[in-house]
């Protein structure tokens, strides 16, 4: 069975690698130490510190596993390989909802790099899916769970 690939920029992959290193070299040892301390309190059946530390350990190990998978199956996308005015991962897109005057700017990233607060939208998000492959001047229909709307692509540029 073919594994899912995770399209991302080189910068996104490097960020994931740093996050993984932090989890393995800092967070994991901290949790192991908390488990040791909690064990020293005696009876584990009513030891809330032990339970909390074990829960945190499971969470950290899950994050490590997820990051290792994303890094292992990362597909580095070179935005220079697509047309200058074509929307792709690694591009910054300025759009305007049809019938509205406000412009919105988004950076298209792989799912691992999505951060709505920083204006980074995943290629798998409704807006990302609608914009990928379109060019400056095109209109795209964004399909959301609550309905659809059209946006006009005003500008596409390489993200710095």
From Swiss-Prot:
Record keyword Transcription present: yes
Gene Ontology BP term (one): regulation of DNA-templated transcription elongation
Function: Necessary for efficient RNA polymerase transcription elongation past template-encoded arresting sites. The arresting sites in DNA have the property of trapping a certain fraction of elongating RNA polymerases that pass through, resulting in locked ternary complexes. Cleavage of the nascent transcript by cleavage factors such as GreA or GreB allows the resumption of elongation from the new 3'terminus. GreA releases sequences of 2 to 3 nucleotides.
UniProt similarity note: Belongs to the GreA/GreB family.
One GO MF term attached to the UniProt entry: DNA binding
Gene3D superfamilies: Transcription elongation factor, GreA/GreB, C-terminal domain, Transcription elongation factor, GreA/GreB, N-terminal domain
SUPFAM superfamilies associated with the record: FKBP-like, GreA transcript cleavage protein, N-terminal domain
Cross-referenced PROSITE patterns: GREAB_1, GREAB_2
The organism's place on the tree of life at top rank: Bacteria
Coiled-coil boundaries: 1-72
Organism: Streptococcus sanguinis (strain SK36)
Keywords: Coiled coil, DNA-binding, Transcription, Transcription regulation
The keyword Hydrolase is annotated on this UniProt entry: no
UniProt name for this protein: Transcription elongation factor GreA
